[in-house]
Amino acid sequence: MGMAMRCVLVLFSVSPVLLLFNFEMLEVALHLASREKELDTAAVTPSASLSFLSRFRIMLGMNHHRSRGRRHKRYSEAPAPAPAPVPAHQARSEAPAPLVHVPRKGMPSTHRSHIAPARSPVHKVKDGGHTKIPRSAIVALGVVGLCLVVLGVVIAAFSVRRSRKFKKVCTKAFKPFRHGSRDQRSPAATRKVSSHPSPDPLTLSSIVQYQQNLPNLKQSSESKSLSIQSTIPMGTELIVSDHAVINNSQSDEVESFHSIPCSDLSAGSITELPQQICDRRAIMNRSEYFLQTHDSPSDSSYQSLSPDCTSRLSPKDQTFTASSHLSLRSKTCPEKSDGENAEINCHDGLEITCISGSMEHQEAPIEERARINFRNPPSQHIFPPSYRTDTSQSKINIAFTMTNSKVESSSKESSRIETSSSMGIPKPAPPPPPQKNPPPNLKGQCYGQPPPPPPLPLQIQVGKDGSPLPRLKPLHWDKVRAAPNRSMVWNDIRSSSFEFEFDEQMIKSLFAYNLQGSMKDEEAMNKTASTTKHVIEHHRLQNTTILLKTLNANTSQVCNSVIQGNGLSVQQLEALVKMKPTKEEEEKLLNYDGDINMLDPAENFVKVLLTIPMAFPRMEVMLYKENFDDEVAHIKMSFAMIEGACTELKSSKLFLRLLEAVLKTGNRMNVGTLRGGASAFKLDALLKLADIRGTDGKTTLLHFVVKEMARSKGLKALEKLNETPSSCHDTPTEREEYSSMGTEFVSELSNELGNVKKVASIDLDTLRNSISNLSCGLAQLRNLVEKDLASDDKNNNFLQCMKSFLNHAENTMQGLKADEAQVLLNVRELTEYYHGEVSKDESNLLQIFIIVKDFLGLLDKVCREMRGTKHNQTLNLVLPLK
């Protein structure tokens, strides 16, 4: 009986005792209360005859003696008061004469009885002043008892649950050792003989047959008998034969493996080792010891051996006889499916034997056994894949138990083997060297997936002389798939259609991979990176290195050009100006006294440039000189476009006619409002014409204005041709003809105002900044020529070159500033011409050109729609244009 069940029985036996103890304590309390006052005959006296149910009711406070109600009053009244009975050991006092009360028949009594009601046995009326025993005390006693019972039940449940968990852990721990009885196991586990015929033991032909039947044996889960002959380090052999299953109907037995000694005896035969079943207690004790000496039963790295077996596994022994109890857990199948430890070789001496009861083997020749020895290294333990356990377990353990109940017999057996080996019995041949790489087919089987396909052979292109072509730099393009159902230009091109042949030597020299050169460059860069000292900040140093590569000139050429003041292009000067260091970096480079080769090439280049007086200011004025003419030409062209746009807007009659049509149409639309009767409007109202739509949802007010202008132009053109007066009551067909004739005239407005569109893209602030930059550059050039370099005679060439340019730049800047003032004046006059006032913000002086440009875009769109539409909706003329 388990410990949990014992605890439960003890708690259940203690609980009634506690309840009875509470009842006895209550009885004693009642007895003490009854000694002071005898209850009347109707009351219940505390005696030994008090029933169990009455005690329980008194404990719970359910047995109260209360007086009855008024309606039962006459039945509860006694004819005469009677004293309470006195115990026999006390002397009786004379009772007073009873007063006889004669109740009236049929009439209820109107007076209440003055006789005290019968008291409960727990009341005391003597001088001691004892009161009723508190009900809370009684309830507390009951609650305490119930709590003890509940506590006992909870402890029992917790113990049962803990015992179940412990059983589960033990079951998992002994799962490799204990498989249950024959009735509880599956048929596949109890079946001793495999459905597949096993090969004859210790023959080479059987090994070949086993290798052929290996895939079938892998899928079969019923074959449980195996014989493993492995090579122990230093020439030791281990042969594990089929295991015998001992069934016991009364208790679970342990499956044990029996081994057969396979040493080379002088008798030339292998004797049968009788099966000895070890005691169940011994197995359990060893299993418990095994669990105590290891942290986890699922650990795949432990290995338990008996002392005798361990002592016999010495390098001097040539054979190993498994005659003592051995519990072995192999390291071959860890949780991580290590391919090297789990790989199987079909030629590793595996034998399948079908044994029922006792085992009989014939002795195999020494030569055959030497061939069948394991070929894997001693550090690896390899097992066939058909006997692998389920990989879903946390760690796979293979236990070989070789049972023998007596340790003395194992020692005798070992001594007998030692004597036989010392008598000169020939030793078996040494095993062959271990196999480095397992076969690929078994490697794929071990991982549970097919082996990967072999890599495709690389196609080596061969030239005309038969030598392999070297690899060149690739040309990255996108291949086009050939379309068999479509004719393409590539179908007419053949590889042999070229009239010329490649110059292989030239293409190799130009585009071949220079692996050695690149490696040398990398090594040189690494060496310089480890030995150089950086003065310039890292990010700026990288930019300087990139700019240095774009110069396409050496240091001496750059220095000579800077000294002379010419000879460098705009791109080179821009790169040199960007290399300008900060003041701190300039001081560090000038004060650097170490080895110049220790500096970075870019830093070394900048250091050489700093040796020239005013090197970077020279570069800046040289760049200013090269860009001066281009900047001035761009500014003058912008000024010319602005002047042309002002002239076009003032002189365009078509634009004036359009403004007239919009003014008349707007006044008609604003009749009856404050906006009506206008004589002028701002040009931004032209953009609002496209927002007002007609009832059809398509025609806008701009459509209407353009059609009327086109009709008016067409009518005038027709009058000039026919010299007939026009009529105000023209038919709709005639109006359509006039409109189609005048649409071309209206669309010409966009061509007349061509400069207006260009000026709209000009930013006046940008023009002003350009002129300001030119003025600042001119001032810097003047300071450099007149002050900084005037005292040095070595700079004569540079000064002469810059002085001539200085005079030209000063005259040009004076004319440019005059043009700027004139252009701004013309823009102000144009703004006043259309708007009547000039905005205070001078940055919006060109806003009028932007408005006209947007309106011309809307006008061109309407004209295209009118040309494309043949059947336009007829519009009635509201205001004829005169």
Swiss-Prot record:
Cellular component annotations (GO), alphabetically ordered: cytoskeleton; membrane
Intrachain disulfide bonds: none
Biased amino acid composition, Pro residues: 427-441
Record keywords, A-Z: Membrane, Signal, Transmembrane, Transmembrane helix
Secretion signal, residue range per the UniProt entry: 1-19
UniProt GO BP: actin cytoskeleton organization; actin nucleation
Every FH2 domain range: 462-882
Major subcellular site: membrane
Subcellular location: Membrane
One matching Pfam family: FH2
Membrane topology term: Single-pass membrane protein
One GO MF term: actin filament binding
UniProt cross-references to InterPro entries, sorted A to Z: FH2_Formin (IPR015425), FH2_Formin_sf (IPR042201), Formin-like_plant (IPR027643)
Region of interest called Disordered, as start-end residue ranges on this chain: 67-92, 178-202, 293-316, 401-471
Record's keyword annotation contains Signal: yes
Biased composition annotated in UniProt, kind: Low complexity: 298-308
Bilayer-crossing regions: 138-158
Family the entry assigns: Belongs to the formin-like family. Class-I subfamily.
Protein name: Formin-like protein 9
Annotated source species: Oryza sativa subsp. japonica
